[in-house]
């Protein structure tokens, strides 16, 4: 992800139409909207903040300044794990030695940065010029055991000299050994934090431009795309599906309607070449789908799978509903190039003597010849009903080729939900699921806590459930080896009816 950090910043500023702000200007523009990006974990594609772990920690820590952001960048390194919860929850922390706390004031009394460790070593009598080499040798495990023992003894002597007791030394020495393996220097943490803040500023103040850029850059990353799309409602941005005559290869924005049109190249098995070809065809006028289909077959590189995918995703919705159009394609493929139709195949092809008399110029004992293909196709398609895919089929189709769905149906009552993700762990009767409300499109991640509930009413991915409400319980987190309740709640599925 980090390799694209500058590319994101550069492309968003270009789309906005202004040069990249210098750091002073950026920090002056950091208002509450910027810090809310972190507090609400709206950080997909933002430097250092993109992972699920990063998001969880930011929701707890809620940084509000460059200094705090820099400290967070350093604190989430593995070597700081033993003190991370204390840091994230902003609990008061002390080394237990006032003089050492004063030295570590800039890092909130923690030994977060390499410079923090260097200050600690100097305080205990090590010459400053040798401190960095010590950190490197610890990190790379270059110390022989006798050398490490000698260093520890020297530091213990310095501790006793300053503190007048050995108490507390072992804890700080362990922190040093842990942190040395992974800690950042302060300048590196600061630069990473600044890169992150650029992203948060652009996302909070220019969300339409930001999401247009990153959705295009990550078009092939379905997991990240899904996470980006889940953030759009916060900014009241609507993601419009791919549409003939509107969509090109990349995502594009419409500032008047505050919406983003999906790019064709972001769809599974599709590419920029067919996007360009279809956009060129859209400049023509087509009275019906059959005429367009003929041009697609003759003048583009679309293969049958790509055509099926785009049709199922309602790309050609101006010409009818998707199941109807898929049926039209089936009719077209069967009869567009038919020169001769055997009479013994008529029933399996859904043809009658009436149709063949009307659309074949010649008849033999066993065949119909010189077929008016276009006339036959149009009459057969005229008998098709303008159907859409059913709910389950459409959601399955979306998840297969988009890896997300935007399907809603306002004719369905608001207590119907469809399962779009289903994961089991050790106990197959305690699944974790993502549910999508068919009426509103709201998505909720929930789980079944009691196996008996699931055994009595089993379901799977793409099942439709009637749910009249959820039970909310406090989440738990590990603290000092024990699970304790937090003030954050999560929905638990206790009662439901399997509708389909």
List the predicted regions and their residue ranges:
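Noncatalytic, beta-rich nucleic-acid-contacting surfaces in large DNA/RNA-processing enzymes
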Residues: 1-500
